[in-house]
Amino acid sequence: MQPNDITFFQRFQNDILAGRKTITIRDVSESHFKAGDVLRVGRFEDDGYFCTIEVTGTSTVTLDTLNEKHAQQENMSLDELKRVIAEIYPNQTQFYVIDFKCLR
């Protein structure tokens, strides 16, 4: 079985599959992805494969520069997005935005 290239919390699976979540915000450990990369996607909880995505772009962002567009691309409110990022990456301020499209 092929390993997954990137994982998402299971709660985001349906939004990714439906095209409602089109970015992911990660820390430096996952800053190596680039436009054109095709990635196997698994669930964080069990590493079960659920789709393939293509990276369409990358950029950097800080917690303070997250905006409504980022929130919309994550399919959540801006306050919720900032809270989720702060929970996942406590004490970090520099992040990497990975834009993607689901290929199935």
From Swiss-Prot:
Keywords: Hydrolase. It is an enzyme of class 3 (hydrolase). GO terms for molecular function: hydrolase activity, acting on carbon-nitrogen (but not peptide) bonds, in linear amidines; N4-acetylcytidine amidohydrolase activity. The keyword Transmembrane helix does not apply. SMART domains: ASCH (SM01022). It comes from the Bacteria. Residues 6-94 form the ASCH domain. Belongs to the N(4)-acetylcytidine amidohydrolase family. It comes from Salmonella newport (strain SL254). It catalyses: N(4)-acetylcytidine + H2O = cytidine + acetate + H(+); N(4)-acetyl-2'-deoxycytidine + H2O = 2'-deoxycytidine + acetate + H(+); N(4)-acetylcytosine + H2O = cytosine + acetate + H(+). Its EC number is 3.5.1.135. The gene is yqfB. This is N(4)-acetylcytidine amidohydrolase.
